[in-house]
């Protein structure tokens, strides 16, 4: 089973948690894109009804529209029943690093408020500790990026401004901000680090999601594995 197949089986498993009349937070990224597609197909077949999606990004919004999923913004709903999203890393306590899609701020706002937060990953994303493989994305005010990189040196982080791939200059978030990717030696206390990074002036939000995931669905070569807090 290849990586894309692992993503697909994780996305399919997440559909089991979706019921009629739910408000669903729709995450960002390649694994969640499979979930949105499958959710739209299930809706079209009449196997589920009266759902509303709350997208965490323009990518999620456009995918939901493409697959005929009714959508609303966060301020148009009273509550979010379940949120489904991917992650860049998952540690043994189900703490996460997220934000490679540069949508981490709205993801955290929506997923923090969800009754149940379900994370979809393939087996490569499981790590012994956060920052083992991936940096922590940090959304920052554009004018502050250089000062914040200097501040991050206190944590022995190797930090750099994320540059665009198909555009000149830095990546711009949906909120009009920049992204700094900070690689720390290791993160032993994710909650403490998450809070501390957000105290730096100019930081909007960071990609550590500590103590927030309820269920992690892992696509593996052998099939689906479910981890719960």
Curated annotation (Swiss-Prot):
Pfam families in the record: Rib_5-P_isom_A
Mechanisms controlling activity: Inhibited by D-4-phosphoerythronic acid.
Thermal behaviour (record text): Optimum temperature is over 95 degrees Celsius.
UniProt keyword annotation of Isomerase present: yes
pH dependence (UniProt free text): Optimum pH is 6 (at 50 degrees Celsius).
Protein's pathway: Carbohydrate degradation; pentose phosphate pathway; D-ribose 5-phosphate from D-ribulose 5-phosphate (non-oxidative stage): step 1/1
Binding site for substrate: 28-31, 85-88, 98-101, 125
Superkingdom of this protein's organism: Archaea
Effect after changing residue 107 to Q: Loss of activity
GO BP annotations listed: D-ribose metabolic process; pentose-phosphate shunt, non-oxidative branch
Described purpose of this protein according to its UniProt entry: Involved in the first step of the non-oxidative branch of the pentose phosphate pathway. It catalyzes the reversible conversion of ribose-5-phosphate to ribulose 5-phosphate.
Family according to the record: Belongs to the ribose 5-phosphate isomerase family.
Annotated HAMAP family: Rib_5P_isom_A
Quaternary state and interactors: Homotetramer.
Protein's name in the database: Ribose-5-phosphate isomerase A
Organism per entry: Pyrococcus horikoshii (strain ATCC 700860 / DSM 12428 / JCM 9974 / NBRC 100139 / OT-3)
Gene name linked to the record: rpiA
